[in-house]
Amino acid sequence: IVGGSTTTIASYPEITALLYFNRQACGGTILNNRSVLTAAHCPFGDAASSWSFRVGSTNANSGGTVHSLSTFIIHPSYNRWTLDNDIAIMRTASNINFINNAVRPGSIAGANYNLADNQVVWAAGWGTTSPGGSLARFPGVNARHVQIWTVNQATCRTRYASIGHTVTDNMLCSGWLDVGGRDQCQGDSGGPLYHNGVVVGVVSRYTAWIQSNA
């Protein structure tokens, strides 16, 4: 998370730190006691055994409970080139135990959820805290969050097209339009985007365009 501030798991008990060979790599949202929602590009092409996730901890590297995976399900229409339908569900090998103010399932927006332009949304995760920085150099060990805003779809599509990226109707754009300095970054992929406490999006991609445009 770039441009945000530290937070605690008590504020976001639905979020999970996804670990690739025991190192924080992506984020996720608890769906129920056996499933976690994330971005398809996180585990795509990997063995389930190479991933695990930590719940119930503000720190990505310690505390809470670590669960291994039994399998993961990539959205059948996921496109690795355009990142359309960039969502996946991870199945745990053991039940997730819900704990008040630390571990609970997220509230997921339904198909008819109405989200207008310029609405306040919040992103949370353990990604790098420096634009262009790597997780190794700028790890987000403690959970962070940032307030951003939804961006008009047509505006988003036009601006991304100028740098050769496709924005489909399945995508939601958010950021700080024409100001920048706040957003999700490397390592936040798969984590939630909240609108009034409801998960309305899964972090899919971050580009340098955000620094000057979003």
Swiss-Prot record:
Matches recorded under InterPro entries: Peptidase_S1, Peptidase_S1_PA, Peptidase_S1_PA_chymotrypsin, Peptidase_S1A, Trypsin_dom, TRYPSIN_HIS, TRYPSIN_SER
Regulation of activity: Sensitive to serine proteinase inhibitors and thiol proteinase inhibitors.
Chief place of localization: secreted
GO terms of biological process kind: proteolysis
Subcellular compartments: Secreted, Extracellular space
UniProt note on tissues of expression: Hemolymph and saliva of the larval form (caterpillar).
Protein name: Achelase-2
Lineage: Eukaryota, Metazoa, Ecdysozoa, Arthropoda, Hexapoda
